[in-house]
Curated annotation (Swiss-Prot):
The modification Phosphoserine is found at residue 11. This is Actin-related protein 8. It comes from the Eukaryota. GO terms for biological process: chromatin remodeling; DNA recombination; double-strand break repair; regulation of DNA-templated transcription. Belongs to the actin family. ARP8 subfamily. Residues 1-12 have a biased composition (Polar residues). The gene is Arp8. Gene3D superfamilies: 3.30.420.40, Actin, Chain A, domain 4 (3.90.640.10). One of its GO terms (molecular function) is ATP binding. Keywords: ATP-binding, Cytoplasm, Cytoskeleton, DNA damage, DNA recombination, DNA repair, Nucleotide-binding, Nucleus, Phosphoprotein, Transcription, Transcription regulation. It comes from Drosophila melanogaster. Plays an important role in the functional organization of mitotic chromosomes. Exhibits low basal ATPase activity, and unable to polymerize. Proposed core component of the chromatin remodeling INO80 complex which is involved in transcriptional regulation, DNA replication and probably DNA repair. Strongly prefer nucleosomes and H3-H4 tetramers over H2A-H2B dimers, suggesting it may act as a nucleosome recognition module within the complex. CDD domains: ASKHA_NBD_Arp8-like (cd10206).
Length: 607
């Protein structure tokens, strides 16, 4: 039912009527200025009206000022993935240097023009000689920075957006800094502010700031607005429930609906099908979309992204004498943001660019003085993004990178879902019809129960216990099968050494999990690159060449002319005003009366 309904929605055909018992969505005029599209990410939040040309992009973090004299340690969620015990004597650094040499030798065999001339690389020692002698020079403040404007409001109880990026190592000690989403999912942990409800509170503070201060929409008027939330393809059902509660009850939107980011990306790019590769700040997700449906078996989220490339770039720059020697991305948000900017300015995947390139960057010191640094960069600008294809370089941010595929329904226990498998097990009667129904379901799943004997009044308690054991054994077997399937599903995205697969091989593995040869061929011919870290020059051509060398199908890697990080947001804005999307909206009254049932029935993806 879900698949046919969602397919008809995406293709523009007349949508199927809602299930009996749920109210028909009211046919109200769609006003794009009254629709707020929200795309939350690990590092950035993109939010804006559906009628806007581009969304606002904010840092998706909040900093709470600590009480004076607080004895506990401040909590700092890092802007960049932390290094995994990296020092000059560690085995990780030895591995990193070995892999750097491997990548360097590969680049030496690249042809730079039609005359078959090979690249000539500048050794790091030569670059270090220049960079170590480079001195910073004083420069005036940027034109956008007023001379009398305070750099940091030290009295503000809460900081948002770029104010957090102005916190150096010393100033950051006065704040608890939280990123509510990390590695593509809610940042739930055992430290301060790490509970699920605390994470939702952080989201509420950030989104309220964006709505009131940046979009100039008073919170009391959100009852006249609607919201579209872009969520991950690999999702946790309980988290989606909390998101809807946040939008409808806590923020007070009139109605909302959810859409998966890869599906929204196909709408934003104007394609009907394709393999969507979303390279974000802290994760890379792959999903195959056909007729507006994200194929369940082909979804995967890999725990590496642009932030990991930042750390690789920093180690490479330090090897060639990085002139800003005090750079401390672990404690200073100023330095972490600087490194992210250097990746965007320096890095590329164009093998024809070789030799030393002179670059500049500006930095504000604690005393308010702006400095200009000059640095020479060679193949370091090319090696850092190549870590997407040589994941051994990414071991510096954790040797074991998590891989997430969509969990089965029975693995996502939710006590508020009346159709949850565990809920049905615990609330079903121990004898009579329901016990037999559960056994019948178990039989259809492949379990053969023992023959039933006639039940007498004296034997009822005995049979009840026997049924409990039978059901428990059956579900244990099914749970083991599900866990094994989940493990096998994740294991196919690791190589023989247990390392997560490179980007090109992960895409091939994801597409090959599809059952139809024709569908596979279509996906290889339409690979869409999106995400904030997919804007590296030359990435699409490099990825296309790598995949073409490993498959026989025609390979086309697409990247649209717009900002790759905004494609999903634009697609969600387009979906929100479509006539066929009317049945997707969930109102406050629907959510209050029906809860998860209405989300299950109206979500445009398989629940």
């Amino acid at each position: 039912m879900q698949r046919s309904r969602a397919s008809s929605t995406s293709s523009g055909r007349h949508p199927a009527p809602p299930p009996i018992g749920l109210p028909q969505p009211q046919a109200q005029p769609l006003e794009a200025p009254k629709i707020i599209v929200i795309h939350p990410g690990s590092q950035h939040l993109r939010i804006g009206r559906a009628a806007d040309l581009n969304p606002l992009t904010l840092l998706h973090a909040v900093a709470y000022r600590r009480r004076p004299g607080a004895s506990d340690r401040p909590h700092h969620d890092p802007l960049l993935p932390p290094l995994d015990n990296v020092n000059s004597n560690s085995g990780l650094m030895v591995e990193f240097e070995e892999q750097r040499l491997v990548v360097s030798r590969i680049l030496q065999h690249c042809v730079v023009d039609n005359k078959n001339r090979l690249r000539v690389a500048t050794p790091p020692q030569q670059l270090a000689h220049f960079n170590r002698s480079s001195q910073a020079e004083k420069v005036p403040a940027p034109s956008g920075q007023m001379a009398d404007e305070p750099w940091l409001d030290r009295e503000a109880p809460v900081l948002f957006d770029d104010r957090i990026l102005r916190l150096g190592a010393v100033d950051a000690r006065n704040y608890d800094i939280h990123f509510p989403i990390q590695r593509g999912e809610l940042n739930v942990h055992n430290e301060k502010g790490g509970s699920l409800q605390a994470s939702m509170q952080h989201l509420e503070r950030i989104w309220s700031y964006a709505l009131e201060e940046r979009l100039k929409i008073p919170l009391r008027k959100l009852g006249t607005h609607c919201a579209v939330l872009v969520v991950n393809d690999v999702y946790v059902r309980r988290h989606l429930r909390e998101f809807v509660t946040l939008l409808l009850r806590r923020l007070g939107f009139r109605r909302c609906f959810l859409v998966q980011d890869s599906v929204a990306s196909t709408f934003g790019a104007g394609i009907g099908y394709g393999c969507v590769v979303d390279i974000g700040a802290q994760k890379t997700s792959i999903a195959c979309i056909e007729d507006g449906i994200s194929q369940l078996d082909a979804r995967v989220r890999l725990s590496y992204g642009g932030g990991d490339l930042d750390q690789v770039l920093l180690l490479l720059l330090r090897k060639c004498g990085f002139p800003y020697r005090e750079c401390n991305v672990q404690e200073s948000y100023v330095d972490a943001h600087l490194l992210d900017e250097l990746k965007e300015k320096f890095c590329h995947l164009n093998a024809s660019v070789c030799g030393a390139q002179e670059k500049h960057f500006n930095l504000r010191k604690h005393n308010g003085q702006w400095l200009r640094y000059t640095i020479q960069v060679g193949d370091e600008a090319l090696m850092a993004p190549l870590a997407l294809f040589h994941t051994e370089l990414l071991n510096i941010t954790g040797r074991t990178k998590a891989v997430f595929t969509q969990q089965a329904v029975q693995d996502q226990y939710d006590c508020e879902d009346c159709f949850d498998a565990e809920y049905l097990k615990e609330t079903g009667r121990k004898n009579g019809v329901r016990g037999g129904d559960i056994l019948q379901l178990s039989t259809s799943a492949g379990y053969q129960p023992r023959p039933q004997l006639p039940v007498t009044a004296d034997d009822e308690e005995l049979i009840v216990v026997d049924q409990d054991e039978t059901i428990s054994n059956c579900q244990s077997q099914l749970g083991a099968q599900t866990a094994g399937g989940q493990m096998n599903s994740n294991g196919c995205y690791h190589n023989g050494q247990g390392l997560v697969l490179p980007l090109d091989q992960a895409i091939i593995q994801s597409i090959n999990r599809l059952s139809s040869y024709e569908t596979k061929r279509k996906m290889f011919g339409s690979i869409l690159l999106v995400g904030s870290s997919a804007k590296l020059p030359g990435l699409a051509a490099w990825l296309e060449q790598r995949i073409s060398q490993q498959v026989q199908s025609e390979v086309n890697v697409l990247i649209k002319g717009m900002d790759a990080g905004m494609v999903a947001w634009k697609g969600a804005a387009i979906m929100s005003v479509l006539e066929s999307a009317r049945e997707l909206w969930i109102s406050q009254n629907d959510w209050q009366r029906h809860g998860l049932r209405v989300l299950r029935e109206r979500s445009p993806f398989l629940w």
